[in-house]
Amino acid sequence: MVFAQTLVARRLEDVWSIVPEGAIGRHWWVLTQRVFSHWPVRGGTQWTPQRLTWVAAMMAWDEGQTLDARWEHAREVAGRLHPHWSLGTSYSGFAAALVRESPRVVAGIKAKFREVMLAMESRHQTRCGWRAFAVDGSRVEAPLTEANEEGLGCAGREKSGPQVFLTTLWHMGLGLPWDFHLGPGTDSERRHLEQMLDDLPQHSLIVADAGFVGYELCQRVLKARRSFLLRVGGNIRLLTDLGWEHEERDGLVHLWPLAHRDLPPLVLRLIILRRGNQEIYLLTNVFDPKQLSDEDASVLYEMRWGIEVFYRSYKQTLSRRRLLSRTPATCLAECSWTMLGLWLLSLLTVTGIVAKGLDPLSWSVALARNAVRRAMRVSLRGRGGRLLRDLEAAVKDRYVRRGPKAARDYPRKKREKPPGPPKIQSASPKEIQTAKRLREKISTAA
């Protein structure tokens, strides 16, 4: 029984300070303590960063319908796998410790997860020659308490309640999260992305739907020496024939809103994709078609759908559409650890899938969820599990469907109108003169 419990612990434990272990084979990882060792802990502390991490991650996987139920189950599993741990006996004490420790612990675990992802096989790191990252935001509902209304705010649709705004960077090659940022429901996904730019690898390509295009964000990405491929809609005005470039090339446009006429216009490349009767307009700062062809741009933009599926997995597959915490601080902590739990589950699963020579994008969230929940139940019965084998087999079905999987006309399904074309206009004589004076002013200052 001791061996069985240790086996389950090893398989649930592949996480916080993860290093490649070639001797084991199949490229699985073993745990070391280096992630937690640099965080000093006072003697007698029950909820250390390591124990908080274990319990919070397993709460993210648990199928309980209340926070108390998830916490009791996760605490029991952690106690079974680590009998020497002295764990607190109240959920309120755990929640207070989680809120207090989350900022430093979450940042440390994110960094470790990214190290592991960068160490994966190079052939899965890129798509169409780019280390591409999709970005998107989503709101998660929070309980309608007075504290949440005041601290989180109400945004989105009319009569909506308090929400947490979650913005995620998703690695399009590995199908894994790369980073995420949280804030009140009134936050901006553009501001969230700006705060995550510095943790992106050099020469990354950011792929996003309409809503991210703006002068300030594009300028910030350019200064960070990253590239982008952003859909643009009818709320954006683009200029041609401005004369800012010495050589006006086909496909070049200028993003130069009135509010930023004291700054240089952004020279960008416009890509127009045609799909049936629909046209999709994309802006990029990659001018060379050899580096990013129209065909590759089409493939990458279509792959951006993976982040939408990721949010569906978070909300529906894990049944985390609505947070359960009653204060803003605990809501943000709950959302953060649900994200880390899903990230960990995907990391464990994708590692096994890649070791078998399969595409990491083939992993099934539902099968991985079932496997880890079964392992948690098995650990309480004192029997060894088969978590690694189950996660390696957690891949999507490969058969070709003959009809839609979803109901024909789900009554509450959102059917948003796609963005219209941007307003593309030739620069007026006044705009050309303004640009000329600005260029002369910049040249004189230099």
Residue ranges: model-predicted function:
Residues 1-73, 86, 98-101, 108-112, ...:
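Single, function-defining residue in the core of a domain
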Residues 115-122:
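A short, well-structured juxtamembrane/interface segment
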Residues 76-95:
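Short, basic interhelical loop/turn and adjoining N-cap
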